[in-house]
C-alpha cells in the first residue's frame, strides 16, 4: 500500500501523524473550528452552501463506537449530529453514487450495477443535483485531470458521478482534482453552492483502513469548518458512506433495516445542529439528496420526494 503524500504539514504535525499517514490539501483549521463546530447558533440560518464527503464500504457498526480506529469520526458525531437509521440504496458502489445525485431508482440504476466506467451503456441523460440552477463542483482526490473518465492509480471514476451524466454541462471545468478545494475555501465567494468531495481509494477506506480514513477526515474536515463559509453560518456538511460492508449482491437497501450492509453512518455538521443530536428516522441517500435540494432551493429529483429530508431532525 502506497503512503499518501502530506501537503504543507509542519514538522511537528508530521511527526504526530506519522503513525497513520493521510493526504491534506487544505490549510490549517482555525482555533474556532477546533473548539466545537456545532450548536454555535440557536436559529437555523439560510444555508447557501452544502458539502458532501463520501467514504466507502463500511457499515454503521464498523464506524460508530469504534473509537480505537475512528476517534475523530466518533468525536464529530458526538459534537454534532448522527443519523442512526440511515441506509444506502443498493450494492455495489456506483448505483449509490448515481442514485444519491439523481434520485434514480430500480431499472434506471441497473446499468451501473457492474461499477462500470462511463460509456454509452454505462451513463444516463437524467438530470442530477449538479447544475440544477446552483453553482457546483466535484473535488476528487488523486484524479489526474478534470472530469477524468478512467481509473488512474488511487482515483476510481466509479466514485465520481459527473462523468456519467451525458447532458451535464461543465464537467470539464467543474469536476476537478481535490487540491482545488483549498483555493475555493480561501476565496471570499469561490466555494460553490454544492460540493461533492471524494477522497482517493486509500483515504476513503475502500483500499485503506478505517484509521487512515479517520485521519484523513481529521486533517481535512477541520479546515472546511474553519472556512469563512462555515464560520459565517452558511455551510452545512454531511459525511456518509456509499454502502455498508459485505453487501456484494445487488439488492434494494433503501428501506431494508434488517441487513447490516445496508446500514451506514451519516454525520451532520452545521452551526445550527445541537451537539449530540441523533435521529432514528429512516433516512437514506435519497433523503440526503432531498435535504441538499431543500437547503439550496432546488427542485426535487426522482425518489428524493419520496423520503423525508433531514432538515427538521438536525435543525437545519
Regions found by a protein language model. Name each.
Residues 1-2:
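N-terminal secretory signal peptides that target proteins for export/translocation
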Residues 27, 33-316:
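Flexible, surface-exposed loop/gating regions in the mature catalytic domains
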Residues 5-7, 15-37:
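C-terminal region of N-terminal signal peptides and the immediate post-cleavage residues
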Amino acid at each position: 500500500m502506497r503512503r499518501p503524500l502530506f501537503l504543507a504539514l509542519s514538522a511537528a504535525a508530521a511527526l504526530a501523524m506519522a503513525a497513520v499517514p493521510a493526504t491534506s490539501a487544505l490549510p490549517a483549521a482555525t482555533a474556532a473550528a477546533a473548539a466545537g463546530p456545532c450548536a454555535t447558533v440557536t436559529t437555523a440560518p439560510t444555508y447557501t452552501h452544502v458539502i458532501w464527503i463520501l467514504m466507502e464500504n463500511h457499515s454503521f457498526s464498523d464506524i460508530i463506537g469504534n473509537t480505537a480506529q475512528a476517534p475523530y469520526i466518533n468525536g464529530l458525531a458526538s459534537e454534532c449530529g448522527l443519523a442512526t437509521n440511515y441506509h444506502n440504496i443498493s450494492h455495489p458502489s456506483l448505483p449509490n453514487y448515481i442514485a444519491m445525485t439523481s434520485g434514480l431508482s430500480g431499472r434506471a440504476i441497473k446499468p451501473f450495477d457492474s461499477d462500470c466506467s462511463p460509456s454509452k451503456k454505462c451513463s444516463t441523460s437524467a438530470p442530477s443535483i449538479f447544475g440544477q440552477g446552483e453553482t457546483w463542483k466535484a473535488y476528487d482526490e488523486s484524479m489526474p485531470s478534470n472530469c477524468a473518465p478512467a481509473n488512474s492509480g488511487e482515483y476510481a471514476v466509479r466514485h465520481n458521478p459527473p462523468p456519467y451524466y451525458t447532458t451535464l454541462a461543465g464537467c470539464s471545468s467543474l469536476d476537478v482534482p481535490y487540491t482545488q478545494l483549498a483555493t475555493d475555501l480561501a476565496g471570499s465567494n469561490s466555494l460553490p453552492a454544492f460540493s461533492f468531495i471524494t477522497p482517493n481509494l486509500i483515504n476513503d477506506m475502500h483500499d485503506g483502513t478505517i484509521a487512515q480514513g479517520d485521519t484523513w477526515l481529521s486533517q481535512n474536515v477541520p479546515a472546511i469548518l474553519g472556512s469563512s463559509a462555515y464560520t459565517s453560518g452558511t455551510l452545512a456538511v454531511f459525511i456518509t458512506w456509499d454502502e455498508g460492508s459485505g453487501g456484494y449482491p445487488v439488492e434494494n437497501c433503501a428501506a431494508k433495516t434488517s441487513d447490516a450492509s445496508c446500514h451506514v453512518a451519516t454525520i451532520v455538521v452545521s452551526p445550527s445542529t445541537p451537539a449530540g443530536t441523533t435521529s432514528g428516522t429512516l433516512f437514506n441517500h435519497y433523503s440526503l439528496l432531498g435535504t441538499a435540494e431543500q437547503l439550496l432551493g432546488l427542485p426535487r429529483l426522482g425518489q428524493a420526494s419520496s423520503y423525508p429530508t433531514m432538515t427538521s431532525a438536525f435543525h437545519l
